[in-house]
From Swiss-Prot:
Molecular chaperone; binds unfolded polypeptides in vitro, and has a weak ATPase activity. InterPro entries: Chaperone_TCP-1 (IPR017998), Chaperonin_TCP-1_CS (IPR002194), Cpn60/GroEL/TCP-1 (IPR002423), GroEL-like_apical_dom_sf (IPR027409), GROEL-like_equatorial_sf (IPR027413), TCP-1-like_intermed_sf (IPR027410), TCP-1_chaperonin (IPR053374), thermosome_alpha (IPR054827). Disulfide bonds: none annotated. Keywords: ATP-binding, Chaperone, Nucleotide-binding. This is Thermosome subunit alpha. Transmembrane segments: none annotated. One of its GO terms (molecular function) is ATP hydrolysis activity. Forms an oligomeric complex of eight-membered rings. Residues 537-551 have a biased composition (Gly residues). Residues 1-23, 526-551 are annotated as: Disordered. GO terms for biological process: protein folding. PANTHER family: CHAPERONIN.
Length: 562
């Protein structure tokens, strides 16, 4: 890039750099954002379709989970990646609503594009969008429905709503019960860490055969076949070390002149190992999990005492075992006491999906649990896992916040109506941006209708009519196209899913709108600059960006499919 300075050109950027400015830059970025939103739009709602994603190695993923789709698409365009970050933030914060947030973000950009063509400045749009978002969150807070932590029925409805439209939908009755029981088990005064709910996938059987284990499954086997296969009324020791003779930290040489001396060394090692096992026995342990190895001789003594032992357990398994059973890990087995032991009704080695694993179950008030998910194929089980993770997230958020909203496009329709009224009180051109924000929110009920095969205009008119008459919880029944009361039908989702979606979508849209200059360094040009392909300029993206930054023409593999 060069600029004139007098009669001499002033070189500012390298020859490989590419720059797009003004309306071209805005148009390119808006197009990228809209393309991302369009790629997941058909997955929204209970009648949403799935996507098949195939990576460079031939691995196949079949899903309609928004964030999974966007991650697997390997998008390179920087503006498009801002929209992907919206989905990732939504997934991290609340676990569901990723598609909603992305679709709203894309529609905000689409509405903004129309206003930009009418010479409304981008900063005016950004300011209006922010005002509308703040008002929307305020209105949502006022309309939220309170729910208590022990309202299991409502929590199950929330979990089921998160599974609707996914591969687990047919078994959502069974799975929602498992999810709620799991989250309630690990909750500490409404503070929930879903890491304490471990998910184990098993290929084979029906989804309905999935189960909740009140305890921990350790992906290990007992260290010796001579040990008991199962132990009832287990007293569990967690040894944060191995049952082995410790090596010295310094190199030493010992000259052995007599075979008896060698035997004395071996006897001494054996005695140390026996003392370790005796310490466990005296403490009352009949199950041992060791962080490191277990010597063969120690295995012999453990088996002789009827103690079931597992070696090289993972650190996260130790954490779960400690939380589930109440055991306290000890670093020196010789210091173990009865108070350090945890308790479980049963510890047994069982076959699960062709693999032998250790089941620690029947734990009283377990604070760490395991969900065993089953499905006919690997793809089915993977999709069930994604649905379960979403459900765990929304139940966690509901327990933490205690507030929910009706689903089915009801809150978006109500917000759109109230924001249009609010726009009348907003001065200047920001009023147009607030109205555009209201229009953008209606993309949710409109898309729900489209994906279900209903007329989106008729559905939206019916929804507006119901809300205008004061039915604020009226939403679209995607199965038959009727407008129904979402709360009474049990179609609800956490308040934070909606507020986070609006917040993230607005931030991403305003950030993209404020960009009026895009400069791509040579190494971001997708390898096209300088390529001897016979073209005088880079191909692909609008606004002259070419292959730079992934190129809108390619979108990192999205291409013309959108």
């Amino acid at each position: 890039m060069a600029q004139q300075m007098g009669n001499q050109p002033l070189i500012v950027l390298s020859e490989d750099s590419q720059r797009t400015s003004g309306e071209d830059a805005q148009s390119m970025n808006i197009t990228a954002g809209k393309a991302v939103a369009e790629s997941v739009r058909t997955t929204l709602g209970p009648k949403g379709m799935d996507k098949m994603l195939v990576d460079s190695s031939g691995e196949v993923v079949v899903t309609n989970d928004g964030v999974t789709i966007l991650k697997e698409m390997d998008i390179e365009h920087p503006a498009a990646n801002m929209i992907v970050e919206v989905a990732e933030t939504q997934e991290t914060e609340v676990g569901d609503g990723t598609t909603t947030s992305v679709v709203v973000s894309g529609e905000l950009l689409s509405e903004a594009e129309t206003l930009l063509e009418q010479d409304i400045h981008a900063t005016t749009l950004a300011q209006g969008y922010r005002q509308a978002a703040e008002k929307a969150k305020e209105l949502l807070d006022d309309a939220a429905i309170d729910v208590s932590a022990d309202d299991t029925e409502t929590l199950e409805k929330i979990a089921a709503t998160a599974m609707t439209g996914k591969g687990a939908e047919n078994a959502k009755g069974v799975l929602s019960d498992l999810v709620v029981r799991a989250v309630q088990s690990v909750a500490d005064d409404n503070d929930v860490d879903t890491d304490n709910v471990k998910v184990e996938k098993v290929t084979g059987g029906a989804i309905e055969n999935s189960e909740l284990i009140e305890g921990v499954i350790v992906d290990k086997e007992r260290v010796s076949e001579n040990m008991p296969y199962a132990v009832e009324d287990a007293n569990i020791a967690l040894v944060d070390d191995g049952l082995e003779v410790q090596e010295t930290e310094i190199d030493t040489e010992v000259n052995v002149t007599d075979p008896d001396q060698l035997q004395n060394f071996l006897d001494q090692e054996e005695e140390q190992l026996k003392e370790m096992v005796d310490a466990l026995k005296d403490a009352g342990a009949n199950v041992v999990f060791a962080d490191s190895g277990i010597d063969d001789m120690a295995q012999h003594y453990l088996a002789k005492e009827g103690i079931l032992a597992v070696r090289r357990a993972k650190s996260d398994d130790f954490t779960r075992l400690s939380r589930a059973t109440g055991a306290t890990p000890v670093s020196n087995v010789n210091d173990i006491e009865a108070a350090d032991l945890g308790a479980a009704g049963s510890v047994a080695q069982k076959d699960i999906g062709g693999d032998e694993r250790i089941f620690v179950e029947d734990v009283e008030e377990a604070k760490s649990v395991t969900l065993i998910l089953r499905g006919g194929t690997e793809h089915v089980v993977d999709e069930v896992e994604r649905a379960i993770e979403d459900s765990l997230g929304v139940v966690r958020v509901t327990l933490e916040d205690g507030q929910v909203m009706p689903g089915g496009g009801a809150p978006e329709t109500e917000l759109a109506m109230q924001l249009r009224d609010f726009a009348d009180s907003v001065g200047g051109r920001e009023q147009l941006a607030v109205e555009a924000f209201a229009d953008a929110l209606e993309v949710i009920p409109r898309t729900l209708a489209e994906n279900a095969g209903h007329d989106p205009i008729d559905s939206l008119v019916d929804l507006r009519s119901q809300h205008d008459g004061g039915d604020t919880e009226a939403g679209l029944d995607a199965y038959n196209g009727d407008v129904i009361d979402m709360e009474s039908e049990g179609i609800v989702e956490p308040l934070r899913v909606k507020t986070q979606a609006i917040e993230s979508a607005t931030e991403a849209a305003t950030m993209i709108l404020r960009i009026d200059d895009v400069i791509a360094a040579g190494d971001l040009a997708g390898g096209q600059v300088g390529d001897d392909d016979g073209d005088d300029g880079p191909a692909g993206g609008p606004g002259g960006m070419g292959g730079g930054m992934g190129g809108m023409g390619g979108m990192g593999g999205m291409g013309g499919a959108m």
